UniProtKB/Swiss-Prot annotation:
Principal cellular location given in the protein's record: cytoplasm
Protein name, UniProt field: Phosphate acyltransferase
Catalytic reaction equation(s): a fatty acyl-[ACP] + phosphate = an acyl phosphate + holo-[ACP]
GO process annotations (BP): fatty acid biosynthetic process; phospholipid biosynthetic process
Keywords: Cytoplasm, Lipid biosynthesis, Lipid metabolism, Phospholipid biosynthesis, Phospholipid metabolism, Transferase
Classification via NCBIfam families: plsX
EC numbers: 2.3.1.274
GO annotation, cellular component aspect: cytoplasm
Oligomer status and interactors: Homodimer. Probably interacts with PlsY.
Function statement: Catalyzes the reversible formation of acyl-phosphate (acyl-PO(4)) from acyl-[acyl-carrier-protein] (acyl-ACP). This enzyme utilizes acyl-ACP as fatty acyl donor, but not acyl-CoA.
Superkingdom of origin: Bacteria
Organism lineage string: Bacteria, Bacillati, Bacillota, Bacilli, Lactobacillales
Family statement drawn from the similarity comment of this UniProt entry: Belongs to the PlsX family.
Length: 348
């Protein structure tokens, strides 16, 4: 019999909460038979949504507060002790849940993950990790970290992001020897500012890392790396540029095809299946969420606008993280390589 896991779900976090969160949780419950899902939030509203559905492997924990999307993160976490997010996070810390899911305030979830669940000993700064597709081969997914948690970094942070991303690629994406690259403004070894030049040397000499150099943002979707390491500012800017370009491109193309000549419309009908397939490659609803990597348990954030399908997919992502022993293996590796994790290149 498969080992069972309990996932704490912030049912009140997100633009479409609690409706889509509860629907997604029920989809995941039916799909993944070894998961128990604890929903934290307004019990009355959650019960209304569940209706006559059996509550098998579903538990509802009532909370009286919620953290809004626009609230100041750290202040909200400190003040709203009975919010769905904070109570769910404390359940993970206390051991009554194995992992945490939320579609709520990203900053608040970061604060909850870092200050309540806690950093893995030896990891200086946890970061946000996401998985993106390669356009030439949608099945070849790649890890991108950091995408927004740490705008300012040290070389050692970037090195640790590479280690965390490498573990995610091997454990969750099942890549045997992930190719690691550093996001930079050129491919040459001496490109970038002092931090990136020093980080390059750390990565180049890193133990058990298949580091193959720098990568420019224009190459991110071309399948040239399995793990891309970035500071949070550059990573977030690149991620939003990718998302924005995809949305703009498809909106512009749709406008041209709809308002074009008869020949254009006939052509549009012919290419529609191919365009639909390509758009699904870049559709975040088909993916999971962003992982707060470097904390003591899986903490995963999906888009605030997530629908039930995305919620279910993200819970499936957490399931793989738990079953692959991702966090315990990272913890063990960092503990066994403490000296390596203290390395910071001297300023030249």
């Amino acid at each position: 019999m498969d080992k069972t896991y309990t996932i704490a779900i912030d049912a009140m976090g997100g633009d479409n909460a609690p409706e889509e969160i509860v629907k997604g949780a029920l989809l995941a419950r039916d799909k993944y038979k070894n998961l128990h899902l604890n929903l934290y939030g307004d019990k009355g509203k959650i019960l209304e949504l569940i209706g006559e559905t059996k509550q098998d492997r579903i538990k509802i924990i009532n909370t009286t507060e919620m953290i809004e999307m626009g609230e100041e993160p750290v202040k909200a976490v400190r003040k709203k002790k009975d919010s769905s997010m904070v109570v769910a996070t404390n359940a993970v810390k206390g051991g009554s849940a194995d992992a945490l899911f939320s579609a709520g305030n990203t900053g608040a979830l970061l604060a909850s993950g870092i200050f309540i669940v806690g950093r893995i000993s030896g990891i200086e700064r946890p970061g946000l990790l996401t998985v993106l597709p390669s356009v030439d081969d949608p099945k070849r997914q790649w890890v991108f970290m950091d995408v927004g948690a740490n705008a300012e970094v040290k070389p050692s942070y970037l090195y640790q992001f590479a280690v965390l991303g490498n573990f995610y690629a091997t454990h969750v994406l099942k890549k045997p020897n992930p190719e690691v690259k550093l996001l930079n403004n050129g491919t040459e070894e001496d490109k970038g500012d002092k931090i990136h030049i020093q980080a390059y040397q750390l990565l180049k000499n890193g133990k058990q890392l298949n580091f193959t150099g720098n990568i420019e943002s224009r190459e991110l979707l071309n399948g040239h790396a399995d793990v891309v390491v970035a500071d949070g500012f550059s990573g977030n800017a690149a991620l939003k540029a990718i998302e924005g370009t995809a949305l703009t491109m498809f909106a512009g193309l749709r406008k041209i095809l709809v308002n074009g000549s008869l020949k254009t419309k006939i052509g549009a009908a012919l290419v529609k299946p191919a365009l639909k397939e390509f758009s699904s490659v870049l559709d975040y609803n088909n993916a999971g969420g962003a992982v707060i990597a470097g904390v003591k348990a899986p903490v995963v954030k999906t888009h605030g606008s997530a629908k039930a399908k995305t919620v279910s997919n993200t819970i499936g992502q957490i399931k793989i993280m738990l079953e692959s022993n991702l966090v315990p293996d990272i913890t063990k590796y960092v503990d066994e390589n403490k000296d390596q994790f203290k390395i910071i290149l001297e300023e030249k």
